[in-house]
Amino acid sequence: MAKKPIKITEVVLRDAHQSLLATRMTMDEMRPILPEMDKIPYFSVECWGGATFDSCIRFLDEDPWERLRILRRELPHQKLQMLFRGQNMLGYRPYADDAVEYFVQKSVANGIDVIRIFDALNDPRNLQTAIKAANKEGAHVQACISYTLSPVHNNEYFANYAKTLEEMGADSICIKDMAGLLKPYTCYELVSELKKTVKIPVDIHSHYTAGLASMSILKGIEAGADIVDTAMSPLALGTSHMPTESLVAALQGTDYDTGLELNQLNVIRAYFNKLREKYIANGQINQKSLGVDANTLLYQVPGGMFSNMLKQLKDAGKEDKLQDVLEEIPRVREDAGYPPLVTPTSQIVGTQAVFNVIMGERYKMVTKEFKGLVHGDYGKTPAPIKKEFSDFILKGEQPITCRFADTLEPEMEKLKAEASKYAIQEEDVLTYAMFPQVAPKFFEKRNARLQGVDALHADYENKSHPV
């Protein structure tokens, strides 16, 4: 009998495919294997949130809320987990408190059990509304430390932040190592410090990008970690995660034995292996995403950001600029006060780095989002931004010091009015709130399909269709 069995959060239905194939796994591809996955005694199955919401309506023509309801029905014995960006919800801007509260309420009502909440800047003010709302709905709140390397980030910084999150109502703490920067002995020291500081469980989430994750996770387990994120082996490694089967085998017969059976996992592995072969054959998995890139320790690009950036550069015919962009990212990050690179700051810093390289002059063109980051719209940066840089970017406008959401008026009534002509369920207003440019087209196609209209040949502008 294991003295301290390690719990597993399986991420193959969310972060694994977000990292390796830009979040393109469909519900139809997931559904056949769900009954087998439901037999495994996971701590939780991460299957929703993050970029899945955007991908569903933008690329897959799926209703993300319907996806969640199907997952809830097909995985009745599992705790379903989502990734939530705090005040940014699943969109790319800060939202008013009433929108955040409503989203949490609807997520739990539709089947979510565990809400992993993070803020890109580790600003606790951006998590307070989401944590309170999740506590109220009875969900398990897993609050994240967005792990990164910089002159201002150390174990004391992370431990103090974890203590703050525990006091705010977190049920567990996740070390969110989105870029695979966490080294083995550093992980041991960090987990040891966290276990001395907080009384709640500690989870390790570490991407394999730099080839460190397996070693770091093992040292973290030895230091007292309670939960570990892994992905089924066909969609593991590279910019994804440590393989589930490998960890299960490594811990068998030890004090940390997970209790998971390799024979049961092998059925799931065989299914996802066929999907992997399909993704490689049709080009959805970029081979560059599958290898180890130790340069990650220099430019700190997380898995999902890397695969999306590769796709964007390929689509623009600018793949030859990849190395230049990767070298520019740390410079932009230093200018912006060392934000951890995770959504939305990864997109903000990454896009600005791309502009700096393509324009041939740094900050010749500055995105609205980068100005917002410097202005304080996304929260307090880990290090102060130099005044001369702030003045240059903001053209003399003063940055804010309060919680940005405190400057926002309640917005749900306005959003409901705007979305009313499309909405057929209460959740649609939230889809619209996060993606107001993309959602209307998705709603029109979905609603036409539900009404038996040929969505491919419908004339949405003139509201007509062939019969």
Question: What spans do the regions from the language model cover?
Answer:
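N-terminal amphipathic alpha-helix/helix-capping segment at the start of soluble metabolic enzymes
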Residues: 1-21, 68, 73
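Terminal or standalone catalytic/regulatory effector modules within metabolic enzymes
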Residues: 38-56, 286-296, 300-467
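C-terminal helical cap(s) of enzyme catalytic domains, especially alpha/beta-barrels
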Residues: 236-258
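Glycine-rich phosphate-binding active-site loops on the catalytic face of alpha/beta enzymes
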Residues: 117, 177, 223-241
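Active-site beta->alpha loop and helix N-cap motifs at the rims of alpha/beta catalytic domains
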Residues: 49-166, 173, 179-184
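Conserved, mostly hydrophobic/aromatic
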Residues: 8, 16, 37, 117, ...
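Catalytic cores of alpha/beta
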Residues: 153-165, 210-226
